Amino acid sequence: RTILEIMARLDIHDEEIAKRLESKEYQSLLKKTFREWSGAESEDKRTYIRNILANAAASSMTSDEVVRLFIDWLKMYSELHFKVIAVIYKHGTNGVSRGGVWSDLGKAEVAENSADADLFKLLFRDLSTGGVIRQHREIDYYGNFVPKTPQRRPKGSGPKPVTSAFDDEDSYELTELGKQFVHYAMTDLPLKIEYNPNKGANQEL
């Protein structure tokens, strides 16, 4: 079923796309995907897989090594991780705070010492460590990061307050890898031919 959906989104009469589909590199991506995903754990993840493979055939925006990383991310991260990614992407280059993400997800207020708060901090830690998101930083004309001006605390102000899981001070944005992941996994190519899932093979990826 997934393969049929991919083909329905590609112009297989385009010489470059046809050549790409037959290439060893693309066939290797297919084998990796089918080997590691005998059955997607959710419909959303199956859709991400389909989008990645379709976009990898139609676009040369990124290398196959990066596409392989995207496939690994689908295995590594939960659907809640991807919801956080989608919210951060929606806010663009200005970034959004953890509190803003929590609000956009429609979550109710919870205590700082709750399991939900710990999980939320873990999501950001995972995505930051994985190179998907980073704290928002200004860049200069040449695309270089501008160093942050250190903020000095007044003497006698006591210990630095603990940062809330739902902090509204620091903003987060997607890295370039994160932006490309959204382009490949969360962007659905329009159908080139009509596809009826009730006809033909019913086999899931």
How should these model regions be labeled?
Residues R1-Y77:
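Charged, alpha-helical interface segments at or near domain boundaries
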Residues D11, Y89, T93, S128, ...:
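Hydrophobic/aromatic-lined pockets within catalytic cores
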Residues E43, T62, N94, I133-H136, ...:
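Intrinsically disordered or highly flexible coil/loop and linker segments, enriched in small
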Residues Y48-N51, K83, L122:
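Amphipathic alpha-helical interaction segments
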Residues S60-N113:
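Short amphipathic alpha-helical interface segments
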Residues R68-I71, E138, K155-V162:
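Active-site-adjacent structural elements in folded domains
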Residues E79-L80, A111-S157, D167-E169:
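Short amphipathic alpha-helical interaction segments
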Residues V146-L205:
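Short, amphipathic alpha-helical interaction segments positioned at domain boundaries
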